[in-house]
Amino acid sequence: MEDIGKAGFFSDKSIGTGENTPLLDSYTFDFDSGPYGGAHYTITGVPDMSTGFSTFAGTGLSATEMGYCYPFGVDPSSRGDGSIHPPKCRYEKSIMQVHPESGDLGMQGATLFPSSPTSLESVRKRALDLHCFLFTQLHCVTDEDLAEAILSPFIFSESVKEPTGPRANIIQRLIYASECLLGLISTLSFLWTGCEDSGNSPPASMANQQGPQFQFPSRTQHKSNSVLAQHLLGLAGRSLHLEDSANFTGRQHTASPSETSVVDLPTITTILTCHVGILSVYRYTFSRIHDALRACGSSPSGTPESELTSPHKRATTCSPLPNKDTLPLNMPFVLGLRVQLEIMTHMLDRMRAAWATAMEDHPGHEDHQQQQEEVKQHDRLSHHKRATLATLKSMLALNGHELSNQDGGTGIGAVGDLGDRVRRLLRNCDKGMY
């Protein structure tokens, strides 16, 4: 066990309550010195752990040796027989694919990342795709899913190529959804300003978000910029063909530049829904891992069972000390858990930074006239920011999330604190052996 510490595998073995030190402090880990049933393996990571999730190659480790601890699916009564079973990989798991252009579900080679310049249509499309992905692929997390994800760095290194493919585990899908959310958060300023920036202006048919501006001229002019108004005045140049349209509901009308064809849909609210949903998945994942680690050790004496099962109490109750009578945690499982904790923690940090960037104020110009325009635009922008944060706080509270002043009311701080508790409890449960 001492060889592992000499390899610099962990940056800190302390069990403090306030530090946030990484469990992994380098990108390459040589871990072939431990006598774990003759298993020798090398783990190699990549610098950006958020996008390089599960790009870890394991060698020389059999499936039997890669068993996982019993709270994640193995009957504790079977621990004494010496047999440990790896989690099942469900190749038949149905994963939704979203084609970047057609929007059809079930297409292979999908991506939720933007493939074109920012426009209202592209942002709506990405928000819709992420919303659908969240509610169809991340709505259910089982202990078996988590056990599979924690050991996946040693089993399926090729799954990183298709984070939404059939071999993608629950954490890969969560990280993928988080990356998509980062892209949507970066578009908030674009949505707040109502596309007033000419450099990011959408097509002419999408330009007006404020609703139709009907102008009814006098009858002597016989002109109107509104096609509907022309029909109301009986001045339209063509009939509506009501019989044909009644029988064929799939007809699409191509808007002319003078028409208002875009409804002001709640795109920002959809993005906020995705944010709250993704945070809920992080919170549930951390809670399930925390409960499993607690089952490996012992609960604090005198702590009611209701406090251990409450998400609020889970985030505030002190970590228990390990029970000397319990078996040590399975080493590959501890290693995989530390890797996945670092990945998820890093992604939460990126989400926090993305929100900070979206909410920051930009310096003004020296030109007086331009300053006046910027003051007006700044007032509108500040109003939209305050309204967005107020809505987000309400949605977080409605879903049982804790709010912290440190994260600006985005709910990331409380979820990150729960992740830190898992890290500290892991240090307790492994008894400093790893």
From Swiss-Prot:
Task: Return the Basic and acidic residues bias intervals.
Answer: 362-380
Q: Which organism is it from?
A: Pyricularia oryzae (strain 70-15 / ATCC MYA-4617 / FGSC 8958)
The name this protein goes by in its record: Pyrichalasin H cluster regulator BC2
Q: Where are the transmembrane segments?
A: none
The alphabetized UniProt keywords are: DNA-binding, Metal-binding, Nucleus, Transcription, Transcription regulation, Zinc
Instruction: Write out the ranges of the annotated region (Disordered).
Output: 297-321, 362-383
Traced from the root, the source organism's taxonomic lineage reads: Eukaryota, Fungi, Dikarya, Ascomycota, Pezizomycotina
Functional description taken from the UniProt entry: Transcription factor probably involved in regulation of gene cluster that mediates the biosynthesis of a tyrosine-derived cytochalasan acting as a fungal signal recognized by resistant rice plants and leads to avirulence in Pi33 resistant rice cultivars.
Quick check: keyword Transferase in the entry?
no
Q: What induces it?
A: Expressed exclusively during fungal penetration of host leaves, the time point at which plant defense reactions are triggered.
Show the ranges annotated as biased composition (Polar residues): 298-309
Q: Which domain of life is it from?
A: Eukaryota
List the subcellular locations.
Nucleus
Work out whether the entry's keyword set contains Phosphoprotein. no
The gene from which this protein is expressed is: BC2
Predominant subcellular localization, coarse grouping: nucleus
Gene Ontology molecular function terms on file: DNA binding; metal ion binding
**GO CC terms of this entry:** nucleus
